[in-house]
């Protein structure tokens, strides 16, 4: 297993061991991932790199409990996922409680303002509307877009919308943040700001951030980079 340097007594928030993912059967089978193993510790910001079709997004979706692995083991914050104890409802609860997702395109609901886009995640997890909105405004203030809390997504700049999307991802205080091309739609200045925010969040919340990216503008923001090619870790697994 390719391991990152362990600091103190920290244990991995994400431990993927021998993960394989296959689609289809027989002549139509596609091997999207083959025996991929990674570890990510609290406070670390890690990149998944590789050409299109290398398996980066598939691995992210397995870690995010969106896709089931065909083989291998996955531990998230100490929980062994996909063993016989886990029902689909358990996986949904795990995603709500422990995982935050950030995507290339923010996918904010166009008919809700910024604060209600964030508050909706909390309400789905069981919070009442008032406390959800209070938490949403706190997050927007923290990400320096509190002055846009009443704005619809169509009125936000690309950078502002992505910060709202980050606030939404952080609503339930996840320990694991998964980002799929989070800066691809941003210029170099805004991309740097978003990555600096993710680094700050990882440090302050003792969270793990895993990002799929092709964006060489932000490579210097990562603690470690895993390179994938044809569904396998390239070389020694990372740098």
Model-based region annotation:
Residues 1-22, 235-239:
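ABC-family P-loop ATPase nucleotide-binding domain
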Residues 13-229:
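ABC family nucleotide-binding domain
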Residues 80, 230-239:
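Conserved switch/coupling elements of ABC/ABC-like ATPase nucleotide-binding domains
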């Amino acid at each position: 297993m390719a391991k990152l340097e362990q600091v103190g007594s920290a244990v991995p928030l994400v431990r993927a061991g021998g993960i394989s993912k296959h689609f289809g059967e027989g002549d139509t089978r596609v091997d999207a991932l083959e025996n991929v193993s990674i570890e990510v510790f609290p406070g670390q910001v890690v990149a998944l790199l590789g050409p299109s079709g290398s398996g980066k997004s598939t691995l992210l979706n397995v870690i995010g409990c969106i896709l089931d692995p065909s083989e291998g083991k996955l531990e998230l914050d100490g929980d062994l996922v996909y063993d016989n104890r886990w029902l689909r409802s358990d996986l949904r609860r795990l995603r709500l409680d422990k995982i935050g997702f950030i995507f290339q395109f923010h996918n904010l609901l166009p008919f809700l303002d910024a604060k209600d886009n964030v508050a909706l995640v909390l309400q789905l997890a069981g919070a009442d509307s008032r406390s959800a909105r209070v938490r949403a405004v706190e997050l927007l203030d923290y990400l320096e877009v509190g002055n846009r809390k009443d704005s619809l997504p169509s009125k936000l700049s690309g950078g502002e919308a992505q910060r709202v999307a980050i606030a939404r991802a952080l609503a339930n205080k996840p320990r694991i943040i998964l980002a799929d091309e989070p800066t691809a739609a941003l210029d170099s200045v805004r991309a740097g700001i978003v990555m600096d925010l993710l680094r700050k969040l990882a440090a302050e919340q003792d969270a793990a951030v895993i990002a799929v990216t092709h964006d060489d503008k932000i490579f210097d923001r990562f603690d470690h980079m895993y390179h994938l090619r044809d569904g396998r870790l390239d070389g020694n697994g990372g740098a």
